[in-house]
Amino acid sequence: ARWCQWYAEEYRFEIEVLTVDPANRSGENVQNWARKVRYNWFKERAEALGAEYVFTAHHMDDRRETFLMNALRGSGLIGITGMNSVEIIRPLAHMDKAAILDYAKAHELPWREDVSNQSLKYTRNKFRNQLAPVLYEVEPRWMGGLKKTIENLERDRDLLLGFMSQWKSEWTETSGEEVLVKM
């Protein structure tokens, strides 16, 4: 956060930093709790500023990690495709982290990575720092293959949700809290 504050001051743009105490998480996993707090705060700030969207820097590597974690938990199509929200825009979601870093280096853009990304205390970091190298050793093309799988499943999810929405509008009607199926 200090580096971000310095950067904002150096380049003269506004920044707001949320400081929270993880002791308030009621035993919930720190990473999950922090994500919920962060996204709730993004939503609150967007509403306060009258913003329709929040942009994040999630990239394809993040999506692969999310996919693998959700798949191993037994998630369904909606859960396994992850990171889907109307309000959140992820312009880098289809780019590999390496490509983003190459771009930053080529254009002399400063880059900082949170030191917690190396800590094996967090499940996501175990995927990133331990499982990913093994997958690369077993199948060097795994990143491209998993990217294609994620994109195919997202397309299937969107198609299925579209069909469900169309069916619902054609074959159901709402009466108070009841949903009635037309015969």
Residues covered by each model-derived region:
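Core alpha/beta nucleotide-donor-binding catalytic domains of modification enzymes
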Residues: A1-P133
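AMP-forming adenylation/ATP pyrophosphatase catalytic core
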Residues: V20-N24, V37, S85, K147-M183
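Internal, active-site/partner-interface "lid" segment
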Residues: N117-N125, M143-E154
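Conserved anion/nucleotide-ligand pocket segment
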Residues: N129-L146
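Short, structured loop/turn "capping" segments at alpha-beta junctions
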Residues: P110-R112, R141-L146, L160
